[in-house]
Amino acid sequence: IDRTTDGSGWVKDYTYEELKKFNAARVKGDQFGFQPVPSFEEYCAWAKNQSLFTNVELKTSIIYYPEIEEKTIALIRKYGLEDRIIFSSFNHLSILRMKELAPEIPCGALVGDRGLKYAGFYCERFGFEFYHPDFQTLTEEDVKECKAHGVGINAWTVNGMEGLEKLVEWDCEGIITNYPEVPVKYFK
């Protein structure tokens, strides 16, 4: 929680009541005042009435949270968000479990800065509809290989215009960004 709040430590070591006491707007200084960490259910309730598509990243690669996949899917279904969600994780066993539980919801194989050799083949083989690489290591050859296997690409973390232009030129399906104003400005 150090990276995104004014708290310190691991999420697993706190109850939700304790997590709500941390300021999730810390990274923006005083711009938004105090913003408590929302629960995933609070997010789903809010998202239900918004016109948006959400990448739900399961943070299970370092610490595994028992039944996180089942609980996540239950909330997605409770709020009717199945057609506006994509699941991703660095832990590909976790997204394999998501595919077992909710085969109708697309999944993306999230990978670090080393990428995956033959990512399209890999994703197709495991039933993942998307490949989520670091955009800085993605090559045009990677894009072609994925497309040859019917696998879409959502690259991360695209925070500047130059990276966005390259991915649009390569006909990637989506970007993951910390600054939504960048693609909004580009596509205006």
Q: What residue spans do the PLM features occupy?
A:
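C-terminal active-site rim and adjoining tail of enzyme catalytic domains
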Residues: D30-F34, G108-K188
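Metal-dependent phosphodiesterase/phospholipase catalytic core, i.e.
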Residues: I1-G112, F126-E129, P133, K147-H149
